[in-house]
Amino acid sequence: MNWLKTTLQIYPEIAVFLSLAIGYWVGNKTFKGFSLGAVTATLLAAVVIGQFDITLSSNVKSIFFLMFLFAVGYGIGPQFVQGIAKDGLPQALFAVVACLFSLLFPILCAKIAGYDLGATAGFFAGTQTISASMGLATDAIVHLDLPAEESKKMFSVIPVAYAVTYIFGTVGSAIVLAQIIPKLLRIDLEAACKDYMAKNGGTTENARGEWHTYALRSYKLTEKNRAVGMTIHEFEAQFPHRKVFVEGLRHEGKVIDTDPNSKLSTGDIIAVGGEYDAFVEFFDHPDSFDETQDSELLNQPVLGVDVYVTSRGINGKTLAELGKTTSSHGIFLRKIKRGPKAIEIPILPQTRLFRGDILTLSGLTKDVERVTKQLGVIDQRGNSMDVAFWAFAIVIGALLGSLVFKIGNLPLTLSTAGGVLIAGLIFSWVRSFHPTFGWVPEPTVWFMNSVGLNVFIAAIGISAGPNFVAGLKELGFSLFLWGVVATTLPLFFAALVGKYVFKFHPAILLGCCAGARTTTASLGMINEKAKSNIPSLGYTITYAVGNTLLTMWGLVLILILT
């Protein structure tokens, strides 16, 4: 044991990786559906390892924290800007109000309990499950120019307060949002989602049509077939809730170019793409059509791609509006993903598309290539990263954040951390217009998000290790009880405001609350309770605004309390 202690003291970098190894391994274990998660497990592992009195350079913590904050900003840029634009403004304003509750109640609880700045910073981060705020709070405390011993004591209790309150902050938030609040507000989530679908043009038949396997068949029309005499547009209009398109036409023995006004005649052979059971419903009399194998009409390549939306003309349009255009002909929309968590958005006629959305499309290659040019660009997820863009963004953000302005004796600064977060937002938003540069692969964003944060957490835990037990004794068991209060009340008041002031539909209300508190685990439980992903419609904008504000609150609460 002495050998291990001495080795870790000489090579503190080993202690960091040991904390990560234990943290990720333990954090991924589940017991009856509950897991600590990598962040909490890494912190606890680091605290235990920190009992060896290991000295770790603060630069390690700072470098990885800046990487993490850039990834946070980069992931939510388009959604954040969308949130403060016209279409997302109600949800963005709600997120601001919810975040104010998340700031107010922890401060009140901490004041009543008599916690110092360090304990309050950790208490806020744990109860609101926003680990990133600890970094900004730490920077703010550093700029207060307090005596070294007092600052050291504050830094040592931050992880104590965080670790004790984070567990209920995570699990409790999910239970409160998915179980307790629906009962208190008398919300039947499943019924609410069905009502939302009905009001926004969604039906069981419609949803089924969006996801059905694409098929391409050719039919020869006889004089008894209902399609004879119709234009192609009129034929396709026979399937208002089903995806069926004429993809080719052979007239008088020749394959000809078609448009919506082309007329169908007896003896024509048409290639029909879409749902096979829908074909059968229309061509319901065997003597009125012959299914043929016209190889020239059927030999058309099918393509499935992910498209990154960048078009100004598409931004904010509903699927119903886009579906009325001729450009949507032959296109099957399989999936909509939005935000840094790639939240899957329900496909409904009134669902709006925004820049930064990723659409999974399928259809004939000619149709997919045509519509891709109008929507944006194919989301080509290469392995190489634009490192120059990434590093330059961090430099610009850190330089701006390093500026300090004093009002009396009070220093006002974004800090390098806050500056990098904002730089990530801005650079990501710019990239949504020009996706040809600044590409950071999704696995790399995950690495910076997860490992960047956990190295920072490990550094905090290792440094606080020697004083952790003393800090826990000082704060006592009441810290956990105060944490329950500070976690629950902001969620309850946010739900009340969302229902009675913003008048959100019950189907998306709890998704808005989960987003404003950046608790993805809660969204999963809410969707499971609702048996639908409709609540996800309230998550992405509020998550973008909430993630930004809750992180910045780490700085703000120190300024308020001083």
UniProtKB/Swiss-Prot annotation:
Q: What are the TM regions of this chain, as residue ranges?
A: 10-27, 34-53, 63-85, 92-114, 155-177, 387-404, 408-430, 443-465, 475-497, 504-526, 539-561
Instruction: Please indicate which superkingdom the organism of origin belongs to.
Output: Bacteria
Identify the main location: membrane
Q: Which SUPFAM superfamilies match?
A: TrkA C-terminal domain-like
Q: Which Pfam families match?
A: Asp-Al_Ex
**Protein topology in the membrane:** Multi-pass membrane protein
UniProt KW Repeat keyword: yes
Q: Which Gene Ontology molecular-function terms are recorded?
A: monoatomic cation transmembrane transporter activity
- PANTHER family (UniProt xref): K(+)_H(+) ANTIPORTER SUBUNIT KHTT, PTHR30445:SF9
Task: Report the NCBIfam families cross-referenced here.
Answer: Asp_Ala_antiprt, YidE_YbjL_dupl
Q: What is this protein called?
A: Uncharacterized transporter SO_2143
> What organism is listed for this UniProt entry?
Shewanella oneidensis (strain ATCC 700550 / JCM 31522 / CIP 106686 / LMG 19005 / NCIMB 14063 / MR-1)
Where is the organism placed in the taxonomic lineage, from the top? Bacteria, Pseudomonadati, Pseudomonadota, Gammaproteobacteria, Alteromonadales
